[in-house]
Amino acid sequence: MSINLTVDIYIYLLSNARSVCGKQRSKQLYFLFSPKHYWRISHISLQRGFHTNIIRCKWTKSEAHSCSKHCYSPSNHGLHIGILKLSTSAPKGLTKVNICMSRIKSTLNSVSKAVFGNQNEMISRLAQFKPSSQILRKVSDSGWLKQKNIKQAIKSLKKYSDKSAEKSPFPEEKSHIIDKEEDIGKRSLFHYTSSITTKFGDSFYFLSNHINSYFKRKEKMSQQKENEHFRDKSELEDKKVEEGKLRSPDPGILAYKPGSESVHTVDKPTSPSAIPDVLQVSTKQSIANFLSRPTEGVQALVGGYIGGLVPKLKYDSKSQSEEQEEPAKTDQAVSKDRNAEEKKRLSLQREKIIARVSIDNRTRALVQALRRTTDPKLCITRVEELTFHLLEFPEGKGVAVKERIIPYLLRLRQIKDETLQAAVREILALIGYVDPVKGRGIRILSIDGGGTRGVVALQTLRKLVELTQKPVHQLFDYICGVSTGAILAFMLGLFHMPLDECEELYRKLGSDVFSQNVIVGTVKMSWSHAFYDSQTWENILKDRMGSALMIETARNPTCPKVAAVSTIVNRGITPKAFVFRNYGHFPGINSHYLGGCQYKMWQAIRASSAAPGYFAEYALGNDLHQDGGLLLNNPSALAMHECKCLWPDVPLECIVSLGTGRYESDVRNTVTYTSLKTKLSNVINSATDTEEVHIMLDGLLPPDTYFRFNPVMCENIPLDESRNEKLDQLQLEGLKYIERNEQKMKKVAKILSQEKTTLQKINDWIKLKTDMYEGLPFFSKL
């Protein structure tokens, strides 16, 4: 449909008009870069028109701001648009309109042919508008018209303002002014076409500048256009569906359609590159201000107007979705964790089952291979293989016992081959089989810890050996020691060293280990919490004891059961005692104390003697060992428990507990308080106390069963004393104590010298044959 527009003075294509708001009789019309205009609808003539009233303006020197009642312009002149007639069939002034339109058409055709080649392509690039509301919204100044063109247009408007007010007809019905808001990234080449004046010289100058600037920034804006194309297209389509109106085919002009009361216009944002003087927009204005504001990207637009809203909206929506998804995610995470734990548990259980089955099968195979062997040399090899297997996997001992390995080993021990007998004794001790005790009952030797004060215990043992005329390892069935007592137990029980040699070695160890410069020791104390060199002590132990395992000492038939006690400090909250044994417990018998027989002898001594402050703690496997005296400085009770595990049906005959001397001061502290040093000293003394265990055992055991030898010293001698005169003083005080308790020593020697009765010997023989042939000897081969 063609529209005839009667133009009085000029045609002004409105581009960035934001709103036209007013009342029924006196309405206000707001245009870009224009002051406030009052207009009213005339009911005198059939051709309805609007007439301007007195121009009222408020000026500002900087940017333009528009609000509900005012409009500011950087110019000093008013801008007035007079439209005489908007009709499709008005005959008045038709000739004049045709002349003006022909000129406009020819000009646009020439420009479009010069740039694009045809008019249709130019029209497709013109800014399009979309009807959104019934009020034309106000926009801020965008700087799309040069100052020179604005002044010329204002002069022309003032000149013909009166004429346009008298001649301009307008339809009687109320017009609904509609606004279109488009994104800044959708600008086309001729989006300023709606603002071209009728002075074609100026228009051509304006268009040429705009075209040049457009192609200069085309590369810069191409990426932005591609990114925003799809979003703007979807927004335009959504608005079309909501409002139910078609897009106007002629953007940039005011058109009146028959049967419609809407006047459509375009709200096209200006180009930032075309106009250099772009004015800032107030942050309090509507969203259209920011959509029309030139910007180089979406981030600037969002940061300028809705920068505070978008993060909040995004956060709110995200938080709502997270709140909804949080329980599900939590349940899923919990279920996943449970499933993972269950899978891990089942996997570990399956691995344990497979490992246990494989261990049992391996044990059975070794036992059967040993039973099929007849060659003595090959038997030694088979026995050693089974021994190594049981050392690595102690849980296989039960399977070996079920396969009746003990009777076969006892029969092998009858063969006159020392190497084979030694190998058999070792594996029997590892399985937990024990020979009968030496005397009428179990004889236990327990030695306390105390450093170099162990020479006092040596004096007591010297007296016992003198009275019994037997070495120490033949007098006792079980020897247990802590710290320095463990050293004596190993030297006497495992290495069978004479007492004189032990005393000499004791003095040498004291001079080699406990000779340390005070300054160097203090530095080491602050660094490793050890005053003395622990590495030197380890090297001495390796040289003296070698690399033999504890269980290998069971090869000697005269070797008693020996144990060294240490303290594990990294298992749980409370420290725990650990027993280094040269034997194993029978399957099904569990000791109250941790321990093992697969360790080396020097490792046992090193762990048991790691006194805090003197030597560094010793890491062995996954355990951290310290001095056993921290828990059990008197290991008599532990020795009794271990013996009951080895010989459950044999009574106790004698327990000899040797101390390293004690010092009792007559000085009494004040009644009111004690010093911090005294408090700490009391804690240490209570931890290393030996007399409380003595009092308990002395009251519980039968008479003439428990004997304690611990002399009282006249001087408090430290455990790291290495001076010979002090060691001689300790030795002398030990001898004096023995002289005062000579009757007690004779009683102990008498008990230790008793032999087994004939009935006990017969019982031992019957038990041996029963174990050897799996039945009574009367029904077996003797």
Swiss-Prot record:
Pathway: Phospholipid metabolism. Calcium-independent phospholipase. Inhibited by (E)-6-bromomethylene-3-1-naphthalenyl-2H-tetrahydropyran-2-one (BEL). The activity toward 1-hexadecanoyl-2-(5Z,8Z,11Z,14Z-eicosatetraenoyl)-sn-glycero-3-phosphocholine is stimulated by cardiolipin. The gene is PNPLA8. It comes from the Eukaryota. The keyword Aminoacyl-tRNA synthetase does not apply. A motif (GXSXG) lies at residues 481-485. Optimum pH is 8.0. One of its GO terms (biological process) is triglyceride homeostasis. CDD domains: Pat_PNPLA8. This is Calcium-independent phospholipase A2-gamma. It is a single-pass membrane protein. A motif (DGA/G) lies at residues 627-629. Residues 219-275, 317-343 are annotated as: Disordered. One of its GO terms (cellular component) is peroxisomal membrane. Keywords: Endoplasmic reticulum, Glycoprotein, Hydrolase, Lipid degradation, Lipid metabolism, Membrane, Mitochondrion, Peroxisome, Transmembrane, Transmembrane helix. It is found in: Endoplasmic reticulum membrane; Mitochondrion membrane; Peroxisome membrane. Expressed in parenchymal tissues including heart, skeletal muscle, placenta, brain, liver and pancreas. Also expressed in bronchial epithelial cells and kidney. Highest expression is observed in skeletal muscle and heart. It is linked to Mitochondrial myopathy with lactic acidosis: An autosomal recessive disorder characterized by progressive muscle weakness, hypotonia, seizures, poor weight gain, lactic acidosis, and elevated serum pyruvate concentration. Some patients manifest growth failure and moderate neural deafness. The modification N6-succinyllysine is found at K736. Its main location: endoplasmic reticulum. Its EC number is 3.1.1.-, 3.1.1.5. Calcium-independent and membrane-bound phospholipase, that catalyzes the esterolytic cleavage of fatty acids from glycerophospholipids to yield free fatty acids and lysophospholipids, hence regulating membrane physical properties and the release of lipid second messengers and growth factors. Hydrolyzes phosphatidylethanolamine, phosphatidylcholine and probably phosphatidylinositol with a possible preference for the former. InterPro entries: Acyl_Trfase/lysoPLipase, PNPLA8-like, PNPLA_dom. The active site is at S483, D627. It comes from Homo sapiens (Human). The lineage of its organism: Eukaryota, Metazoa, Chordata, Craniata, Vertebrata. It is an enzyme of class 3 (hydrolase). A motif (GXGXXG) lies at residues 449-454.
